[in-house]
């Protein structure tokens, strides 16, 4: 009998730092800028990617120094996870918190990010670089719940 994977055995707070980091599928959805309506506080997703995001790989160009380059970059932690209510339904942190299993395309399950890109979970197919955008409102994704 094989042992169940760590994400099925542990809560987020029980995970090691390495286990926590490995949960991230690298989809890049966290790296897309969001706009907030000041009147309604509704969050609008854009396809505008942080300049530090390598759109092809969906990985940060300067992960270790990201806060130096992008002071507004979010740091998702065990303590603040629930404050990010915009996390997509596909987010492993959210899934594990909700006691759900990881999808078959998740790199921890299938061993590669190829399936995630093929399933169009990553932002690779929609993202544009922040430095190339003039009017962010032209880049709002008018799909409620786009971030699955």
UniProtKB/Swiss-Prot annotation:
Domain of life: Bacteria
Entries under InterPro entries matching the protein: Puta_zinc/iron-chelating_dom (IPR005358), UCP006173 (IPR008228)
Protein family membership: Belongs to the UPF0260 family.
Protein name: UPF0260 protein ECA2365
Organism in which the protein naturally occurs: Pectobacterium atrosepticum (strain SCRI 1043 / ATCC BAA-672) (Erwinia carotovora subsp. atroseptica)
Source organism phylogeny: Bacteria, Pseudomonadati, Pseudomonadota, Gammaproteobacteria, Enterobacterales
């Amino acid at each position: 009998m094989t042992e169940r994977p760590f994400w099925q055995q542990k809560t987020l707070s029980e995970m090691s730092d390495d286990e926590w980091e490995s949960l991230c599928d690298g989809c890049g959805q966290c790296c897309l800028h969001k706009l907030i309506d000041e009147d309604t506080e509704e969050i609008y997703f854009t396809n505008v990617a942080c300049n530090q995001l390598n759109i092809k790989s969906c990985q940060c160009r300067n992960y270790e120094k990201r806060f130096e380059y992008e002071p507004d970059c979010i740091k998702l932690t065990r303590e603040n996870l629930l404050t990010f209510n915009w996390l997509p339904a596909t987010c492993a942190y959210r899934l594990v918190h909700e006691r759900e299993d990881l999808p078959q395309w998740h790199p921890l399950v299938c061993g590669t990010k190829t399936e995630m890109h093929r399933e169009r979970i990553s932002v690779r197919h929609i993202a544009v670089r922040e430095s190339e955008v003039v009017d962010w409102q032209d880049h709002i994704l008018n799909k409620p719940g786009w971030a699955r």
